[in-house]
Each structure stands twice: as C-alpha cells, then as structure tokens.
Amino acid sequence: MTHSMIPAACMEKRCLKKRQPRFREKFPRLRKGGKNPPSVTQSPCLITFGLYSTRDCQEGSRLFTVNPLFRIMTKIAKSTFTTGTGTPGQFYSLPALAENGYPRLNRLPVSIRIVLESLLRNCDGLKVTEKDVDNLASWNANNPGSYEIPFTVARIVLQDLTGVPLLVDLAAMRSAVAGLGKDASVIEPLVPVDLVVDHSVQVDWAGCTDALEKNLDIEFQRNAERYEFLKWGQQAFQTFSVVPPSVGIVHQVNLEYLAQGVMEKDGVYFPDTLVGTDSHTTMINGIGVVGWGVGGIEAEAGMLGQPVTFLVPEVVGVHMTGELREGVTATDLALHVTQMLRSHGVVGKFVEFFGDGAAALPLADRATVANMAPEYGATMGFFPMDERCSDYLRQTGRSEEAITTYENYFKAQNLWGMPRNGDLDYTDQLELDLSAVEPAVSGPRRPQDHIRLNSIRDSFRKLVSMPVAEGGYGKKESPEVTVSMHSPAGVPVPVDGFSQEAKLKDGSILIAAITSCTNTSNPGLMLAAGLLAKKAVERGLNVPPHVKTSIAPGSRIASDYFATNSLQESLDALGFETVGYGCTTCI
C-alpha cells in the first residue's frame, strides 16, 4: 500500500466519518493478522483492526492511530519455551511485556497475570483493545481502578441442568442455518465445551446395598429424552463432549480429568482458563487454573468466542503460615477461611493464597478451600502453580510430556512456584496461621456461622429457642413436646420405608448425607468419615431408623479409598451405602 491509497483526510490527521462497513472493502489487506504495509511508519494514521487502534475525536468521528502494542507484539508473540517433547513452543511472553514499558508487571498477583495473558493473546483491536491490555498491565494494588476486562477463556464447563438449554440454543441456530439453505455445521462452539451429567441423580433409595443401581435406573427413566439429546449433541458438535451420568460431580471431574494446566492451539501455548455454569466452579482454582461460575448467557457467549467481561477486581492476599494440627481437616480450614473472609469482605474480589503454609497444603485440601469461594463471597479462591500441582497431574494420569510442558511454560512466564511474603502486591493482605484452625462446623443457616465442634450441642439448643429476628428458629425448647407439620403434637409420625414409627420434634435429625463437591473427593476427608464409622460400629453405636443415610462420592475413585482400607463394611453397617455419584442431597 502506498501513500496515494490513503485518504487525504487521514494523511492530514483529520477525523474520518464512521463508515466501518466500507473499511475492509477499501483496505482489504488491513485485517487481523495481516502484514505490516510499508507505509505504516510514515503514515500518521491507517485504518485496520488489531495492528491499529481507534480513539474518539471531539466532533464524534474517529481518528485512527498506530496501535502502540504492535511495536512489541512480534517479540512477545514469537517467544518460545521448550515443551515436554523437546521441541520449541510459542507463547505470548509476559516477561517480554514487562521489559517493554511495564516494569512492575512481575509484582502483579498471579491470577491477574494469567488474565492479562489472555488479553494480550486475544488483542485484536475490537473485542480486546490495546487499552484493555495497558489497563491491566498497569494494575495498581492500591487503586485498581474501575473498568471492564474482556476475558477470553480457553474452555467452558457445564453441568446438565444449565447445560441442556445452551445445547438447545445451538441446535436451534443449526436449524435456522439449515432453513436458509446453508451448511448447518458452521454453527460450532469456538472453544472446547465439556458437560458433566451430575445434577439429575436423586436419592430415591438409600440404606440398602443395591441403592446405587436402583437410583441409576430411575435416573435414566426420568431423563431418557434429555440424555438422548445430550448424546446427539456430542455426536453433532466437534468441540462438545459429555461426561455420562454416575461418573462424578462436575467440579471433581474437572479437577481429576478435564484440567490440562496448559493448552495449545496452532502451535501457541497458553494457560488453561475457564468459566462454568455452577458457582463452585472455583474448585479448579486449587490447581492454579483461573475460572469461576457464570450465568448461562455468559457461558453461551464464551462458547461462541466472545469475552466474559467483569470489572477489574481488587485482589486480597491470604498469607498462610504454619500447618494444620493433627485431627484438623480441610473442611475445618475451609470453614475458618469462610468466617475470616466473610468478616473482611471479599465480594467481587479475587482471593489469592500464598506463603509457606499454602505451599505445604496437599492439592486436595487447596481444592476444598477454593471450592468454598462462593460461600466466602469471592470471585475466586486461587492457589498459584507449584510442584504440588505437578504431582497431582501425575497422580491423575497426565503424561510426563504434558507435565513437563506445564512446568516449563509457567517457568518461562515467571509464574511458577508459590509466592512468599513480600513477593507480590495485593490490595489487602490477611494473615492465617494454620495451626490456629480448630475442628468446627457451620450453620445451621449460613456457612459463615462458625461453631466449634465441642460447642455444637449447646449452640444448636440455643438456636432452636432464639428469636427468628436474631437468627434462631423461635421454638420453645421442650423435650416433652413432639411436633410435626402434618400431625397433632405428640402423635407419632410414621416414617415410610421402616417397620417402626418415630417421634419427631424440633431439632430431630432426619438426613445424614456424606456428600457435596467440597468434601467427597478429598482423600483425607473421606478416610476420616470411614474411620469415624468404624469407631462407631466398634462402640456399638447405630443410626435411628428415621434418619435417611447416604453417601455420594464426588468421583468413583473415592469409593476405592473405602474398599482399599476396609472401611466400606463399617459404613454399610450404619446405612451409608453409596447411592450415586453426583450432587444428590445438596440440590
């Protein structure tokens, strides 16, 4: 292209009227990924997308100027590292960006830098502009600012209740395209989409040895049409896959099987990032993957290659020191963190855990804490990548080549290893001594209502009689009065499925379920449940017949923990037979 091809108004730095539909016709070579025309350095402005940017003029028209990132984009985009196969892999280098005008970039929180890499890699002047990159690369811990970030994720994770409507939309779009006489296959998710069927199972049968098989049969009968539709979707779309029923809970399947750490497309490597249609998608933060739960519309936009936008967050750093005492579990830690962060206030913020205490936590415990991010109100509860992550990937069947690629990539990005105190800048920093965490439960209403285990009896009795306005139930504490919603006080309430009747009153326990995506794939927590059952059986304890008992592991591997350690017999003796692999009682 020569100067003669450029409008005189542009050469004179005058404003051009907005006629964007004609831009590509007039300058067909100037498009995303196009080559730099010879006249770029001499021209005061050129019209294009990606290599150049726009800014508004006072008259309301638009002046086009050279994208300042273009001068360093070639260097950033052509950075390489050694993959697990020994061959070079291309990546968008954050250290190279830091060397070109952003000297404090290496002090940004790890989670912010991973989002920044996505902006840098997807900067096209339209969906993501150089201003977006500049804003986030200049993130200030003391004053993050107020602007939106267009975050393009690497993949989408769905569960069946929210995922089916999205698949219906894709099918409808294909039907519309076919009706126009076009090729329906042009409708295809632009990023990989995984749907895990885990929300449809119900606990119709419990406390019997064949509960799993019976519940699974009923599940398929109830959902036959939905499951046939999902099977069609997996066959019809190249980038859409389905994890079938009775495999596990979506977040644990995501952690054990779907997470890759680093992804590759067209020879370019980039971090594994995602959004999911469930609030506890944050469990994946435990392995250093940026991701959180969104609504169906946002997830569908992400499927079609659109960025997920959110306001630039503050980042609260939690400096962990010490280690958990014997007998203190990951659940105790998660509840402690929930109470602490609820008190501090982290709604809409990123939380990033770091320090020697965080480095010592097993990855399963990190995932348990990260899973609770919706309960403590944060967008994410993020743990940076380190050797614990590599070990977990190895234990869950990833190849050594993939793990080496994973480690080398994040080392090349200066993102490898658990940060220590003072390494990074955070909006706020909290201190957490893990040795101070005590066994506890939460509730019975809110997750931040933290109750020490040795105080649970007195606390619950107090809550029963406490006024509703103060968080209680407003009931008279009278062990002599038997009440029921459907029978006069004092009349025994028959319990279906049992040969005997039970007298129920306020405070009676009716359901005892070992379940939830937070706990039921953590080896330590599941073994603790099995050992507790074993001790209860040894002491001659039993469960009252009116209590519905069940266990629903987060993945099938969790059942092996019990079988391998001879704990399943004790659980069965108390009525805790496996009823399914899914969300079950939590829904």
PLM regions and their residue ranges:
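Fe-S-dependent hydro-lyases/dehydratases of central metabolism
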Residues: F70-I587
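Targeting/processing segments of secretory and organellar proteins
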Residues: K32-G33, F49, D56
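Basic, low-complexity intrinsically disordered segments
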Residues: T2-G34, S39
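Acidic, Ala/Val/Gly-enriched low-complexity intrinsically disordered segments
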Residues: A9, E25, V40, D56-G60, ...
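Aromatic (phenylalanine/tyrosine) cluster motif
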Residues: F23, F27, F49-Y52, F64, ...
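Periodic, rod-like helical contexts
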Residues: P28-R29, S43-I47
